[in-house]
């Protein structure tokens, strides 16, 4: 998977929707400021620029998490700008790799994914907007929700949740883990695997 390599680097201040971003990071499992910082790709000190009252020693309730997301939403554009600047190099590396592998609009390709929401593929499409104008097609075995935009089209074998879906994902997980970034070796961009 390329969630770590595409989601944060794809953030554009003018298009960023914080509430949607958090929705795809399991907000019901957020219990600390540290987790909020991790989701946003920030350190605790960086998070304090937007939430000066952060305390690392308390557990957050679900209503408090929603309140914090609301406070961050009021600063959405500034936060997105900060994240975008922080991840600019990773964005350039991802775009270089994707351009190397896919090229321009003459290339025909599709992505295949086991289980997902389509959100990471939306992020991929956002990364590719400067060099690829056609919608990106992704085929999912199971699509939990349907996130499409003008830049991506998702197809699903099972269009909703199926029993034992998480077991299927465990059995099919890549042994090398997620793609966490990209690096250039001998003038060739390659994935850095986690």
Q: Which residues does each PLM region occupy?
A:
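Long, charge-dense
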Residues: 1-40
């Amino acid at each position: 998977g390329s969630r770590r390599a595409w989601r944060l680097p794809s953030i554009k201040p003018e298009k960023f929707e914080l509430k949607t971003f958090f929705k795809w990071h399991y907000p019901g499992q957020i219990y600390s400021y540290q987790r909020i910082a991790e989701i946003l790709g920030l350190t605790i000190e960086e998070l304090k620029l937007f939430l000066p009252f952060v305390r690392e020693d308390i557990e957050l309730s679900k209503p408090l998490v929603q309140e914090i997301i609301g406070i961050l939403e009021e600063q959405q554009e500034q936060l997105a700008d900060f994240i975008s600047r922080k991840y600019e190099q990773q964005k350039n590396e991802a775009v270089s790799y994707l351009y190397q592998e896919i090229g321009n609009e003459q290339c025909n390709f599709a992505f295949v994914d086991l289980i997902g929401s389509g959100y990471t593929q939306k992020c991929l499409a956002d990364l590719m907007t400067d060099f690829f104008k056609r919608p990106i097609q992704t085929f999912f075995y199971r699509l939990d929700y349907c996130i499409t935009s003008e830049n991506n089209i998702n197809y699903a074998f099972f269009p909703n949740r199926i029993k034992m879906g998480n077991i299927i994902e465990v059995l099919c997980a890549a042994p090398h883990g997620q793609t966490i970034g990209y690096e250039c070796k001998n003038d060739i961009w390659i994935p850095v695997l986690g």
